[in-house]
């Protein structure tokens, strides 16, 4: 609820919203003795769809006029309820006494209630451009309270109709000269005009007009100026109003300080706003400010503290959505808020986490998560899921797993999304382990999943099997395969292929045959990789007749041997010292229109060179160069060494310079 200001009047008490008094206000008169005899209801003071002011005027024969209005929303749109000219402590209600005779009907001079329709009156003036236009409408209206003009001017301002607002003031200035100063624009009229003209660069002109009319600005005027400069982007000029008010002998009030904080908000200067508040709090503690008895400063400071927390949150959110990386600023402001004793709410912490969407934001998200866990008893599950996603995006998978572990240990209970997010991170980690052959890491990840109640799926087991195969860890591959079956997962062709490869690299050819036969028995169709592995197994056993049968079987199933398949055979022959057989398979792959690559030539050249066939190795090297292949230095050195050892004559110029290891493609 808003604080209420209670001001004494001659006829009672004025009760109104402290923060929304001068403009967009709600107030009423409380009379301890008499009742209200005259009541005039002024409906809407503005006619646009974007604004609404409900207004009342209470009139009695012995009482002054009290104007009230109530808006649909705060002009600043701030949750703090700060109006840009929302307070006037020196409001002198009843400065212009309304004659009840003027409001009475012609029925025998009896005084009756008269309804003044401000909305209709303002609507009739909407096209006014000069004082003459206003006079044409108001000449038969008699004397109207100045509050009516204030309401209309504010309404024109909200509807961006500046010409009729200025025309009304010009008409009042004319009336002032005609009435000898009895009727004319006063401070409240000019404050209303100043507010209506904000955003149109007319502030200086209005101030000059006030000076010519001999009207001295008050604190509301300066508060309004501060907002005007802020909306025009003149932030330093807006903050300079604080010093100007003191120079003019006015003490800044809570609205002044709140508006200054809003300026820092518009500047997106969270540190500046926080430093301003800390300095303000120190001055209040020393009683250098807050001595105005018209305010409950203790209550106002509670609101200011809430407001600075809100501003810091908004600024940090703006920093996080910028294209630039402002994470360091966010962390510094969070630490500065801790030092100042300003702590955002849990909801604000969580909304900041939602604003963390880029990889570099993970450090901010992690810090905010830590603060929520330490300072609050609860945290939103959706926020935790977002953090798990963010950590994965930033490749901080272990940090994501820690958050998941917190959900299991501290709550809230993870849901299906939590599970899927963590499993997806394990997929990435296991895939990396598979590609790099980091088999121990893969096994560790599987154990971690099981420890946290996450059942590894088929693709997870396969990833670790492939990692074991690449690392030539035959024993580990066998254990993983068995564990996969024991956990109820049915092996796929990838599973069998990885196991076959591991067995082949461990030269466990008989075991490989048993696995192959079992795969066929359970109905798993071999793929190219599995056939290639078995080709390598048969080559290692030198069972070339079975190898021919295997290749025919591949052809019958529409699976064409690839360069990798022939390389596996040639490589197996080379390891067993069968360079002649390797050379035959080289010609066979050519006859089957499979083009050899660098690996093919390098393995075959080395096999021939080491098998006392330097001339043939030399010719293959030259052939590879002529085909545009870039061989490494290893076959080059093998050819040169073999030629020297066996006395072969070769042309080193044709071989060219020795390849650099760094230039190996």
Swiss-Prot record:
Query: Subunit comment for this entry?
Result: Interacts with HCF173.
Q: Where is the transit peptide?
A: 1-68
Summarize the record's disruption phenotype note.
Answer: Retardation of photoautotrophic growth. Reduced efficiency of photosystem II (PSII) subunit mRNAs (e.g. psbJ, psbN and psbA) ribosome loading and impaired synthesis of PSII reaction center proteins (e.g. J, N and D1) leading to reduced PSII activity and biogenesis, as well as reduced grana thylakoid formation. Reduced production of PSII subunits D1, D2, CP43, CP47, PsbE, PsbF, and PsbO, and, to a lower extent, of PSI subunits PsaA and PsaB. High levels of nonphotochemical quenching (NPQ).
- Which family does this protein fall into? Belongs to the PPR family. P subfamily.
PPR repeat spans? 145-179, 181-217, 218-252, 253-283, 309-344, 345-375, 380-414, 422-456, 457-491, 492-526, 527-561, 562-596, 597-631
- Which NCBIfam families does UniProt cross-reference here? PPR (TIGR00756)
Localization, per the record, is: Plastid, Chloroplast thylakoid membrane; Plastid, Chloroplast stroma
Q: Per UniProt, what is the membrane topology?
A: Peripheral membrane protein
Identify the Pfam families for this entry: PPR, PPR_3, PPR_long
Q: What keywords appear on the UniProt entry?
A: Chloroplast, Membrane, Plastid, Repeat, RNA-binding, Thylakoid, Transit peptide
- Tell me, in a sentence or two, what this protein's role is: Required for light-regulated photosystem II (PSII) biogenesis and grana thylakoids formation by binding to the 5' UTR of PSII subunit mRNAs (e.g. psbJ, psbN and psbA) in a light-dependent manner through a redox-based mechanism, and facilitating the association of HCF173 with target mRNAs, which encodes PSII reaction center proteins (e.g. J, N and D1), thus regulating its expression by modulating ribosome loading.
- Please tell me the species this chain comes from: Arabidopsis thaliana (Mouse-ear cress)
Task: Cite the PROSITE patterns for this sequence.
Answer: PPR
Listed GO MF terms: mRNA binding; ribosome binding; RNA binding; translation activator activity
Q: Name one GO cellular component term.
A: chloroplast thylakoid membrane
Transmembrane ranges, per UniProt, are: none
List the Gene3D superfamilies hit by this protein, alphabetically.
Tetratricopeptide repeat domain
From the UniProt record, list the coiled-coil ranges: none
Q: Which domain of life is it from?
A: Eukaryota
Q: Report if keyword RNA-binding is assigned.
A: yes
Q: Which GO terms describe its biological process?
A: photosystem II assembly; plastid translation; response to light stimulus; translational initiation
Record bears the keyword Chloroplast: yes
Q: What is this protein called?
A: Protein LOW PHOTOSYNTHETIC EFFICIENCY 1, chloroplastic
């Amino acid at each position: 609820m808003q604080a209420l200001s209670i001001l004494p009047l001659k006829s009672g008490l004025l009760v109104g919203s402290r923060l929304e008094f001068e403009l967009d206000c709600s107030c009423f008169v409380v009379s301890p003795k008499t009742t209200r005899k005259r009541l005039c209801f002024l409906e809407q003071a503005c006619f646009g769809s974007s604004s609404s002011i409900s207004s009342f005027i209470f009139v009695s024969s012995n009482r002054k006029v009290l104007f009230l209005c109530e808006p649909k929303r705060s002009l600043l749109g701030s949750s703090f309820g700060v109006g840009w000219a929302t307070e006037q402590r020196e409001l002198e209600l009843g400065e212009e006494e309304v004659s009840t005779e003027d409001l009475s009907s012609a029925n025998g001079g009896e005084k009756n209630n008269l309804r003044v329709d401000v909305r209709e009156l303002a609507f009739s003036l909407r096209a006014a451009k000069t004082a003459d236009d206003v006079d044409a409408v108001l000449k038969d209206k008699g004397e109207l309270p100045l509050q009516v003009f204030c309401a209309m001017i504010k309404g024109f301002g909200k509807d961006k109709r500046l010409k009729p607002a200025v025309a009304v003031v010009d008409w009042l200035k004319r009336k002032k000269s005609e009435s000898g100063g009895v009727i004319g624009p006063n401070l409240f009229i000019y404050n209303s005009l100043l507010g209506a003209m904000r955003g149109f660069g007319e502030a200086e002109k209005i101030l000059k007009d006030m000076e010519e009319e001999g009207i001295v600005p008050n604190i509301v005027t300066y508060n309004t100026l501060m907002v005007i400069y802020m909306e025009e982007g003149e932030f330093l000029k807006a903050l300079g109003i604080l010093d100007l008010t003191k120079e003019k002998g006015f003490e800044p009030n809570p609205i002044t300080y709140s508006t200054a904080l809003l300026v820092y908000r518009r500047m997106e200067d969270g540190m500046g706003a926080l430093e301003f508040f800390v300095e303000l709090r120190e001055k209040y503690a020393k009683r250098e400010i807050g001595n105005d008895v018209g305010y409950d400063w203790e209550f106002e400071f509670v609101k200011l503290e809430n407001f600075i927390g809100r501003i810091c949150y908004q600024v940090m959110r703006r920093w996080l959505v910028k294209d630039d990386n402002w994470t360091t600023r966010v962390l510094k402001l969070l630490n500065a808020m801790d030092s100042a004793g300003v702590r955002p709410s849990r909801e604000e912490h969580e909304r900041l986490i939602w604003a963390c969407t880029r990889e570099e934001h993970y450090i901010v998200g992690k810090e905010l998560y830590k603060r929520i866990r330490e300072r609050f008893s609860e945290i939103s599950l959706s926020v935790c899921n977002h953090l798990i996603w963010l950590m994965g995006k930033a490749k901080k998978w272990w940090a994501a797993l820690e958050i998941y572990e917190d959900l299991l240990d501290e709550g809230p209970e993870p849901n299906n999304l939590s599970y899927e997010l963590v499993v997806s991170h394990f997929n990435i980690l296991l895939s990396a382990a598979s590609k790099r052959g980091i088999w121990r890491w893969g096994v560790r990840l599987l154990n971690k999943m099981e420890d946290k109640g996450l059942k590894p799926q088929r693709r997870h087991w396969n990833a670790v099997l492939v990692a074991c195969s690449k690392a030539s860890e035959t024993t580990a591959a066998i254990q993983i395969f068995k564990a996969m079956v024991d956990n109820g997962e049915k092996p796929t062709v990838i599973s069998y292929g990885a196991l076959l490869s591991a067995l082949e690299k461990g030269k466990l050819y008989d075991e490989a045959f048993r696995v192959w036969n079992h795969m066929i028995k359970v109905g798993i169709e071999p793929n190219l990789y599995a056939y290639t592995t078995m080709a390598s197994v048969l080559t290692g056993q030198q069972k070339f007749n079975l190898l021919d049968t295997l290749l025919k079987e591949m052809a019958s199933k529409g699976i064409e041997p690839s360069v990798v398949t022939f390389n596996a055979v040639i490589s197996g022959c080379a390891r067993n010292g069968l360079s002649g057989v390797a050379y035959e398979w080289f010609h066979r792959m050519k006859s089957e229109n499979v083009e050899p690559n660098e690996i093919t030539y390098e393995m075959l050249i080395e096999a021939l060179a080491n098998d006392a066939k330097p001339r043939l190795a030399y010719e293959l090297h030259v052939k590879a160069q002529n085909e545009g292949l870039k061989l490494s230095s290893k076959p080059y050195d093998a050819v040169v060494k073999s030629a020297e050892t066996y006395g072969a004559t070769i042309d080193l110029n044709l071989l060219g310079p020795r390849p650099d290891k760094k230039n190996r493609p």
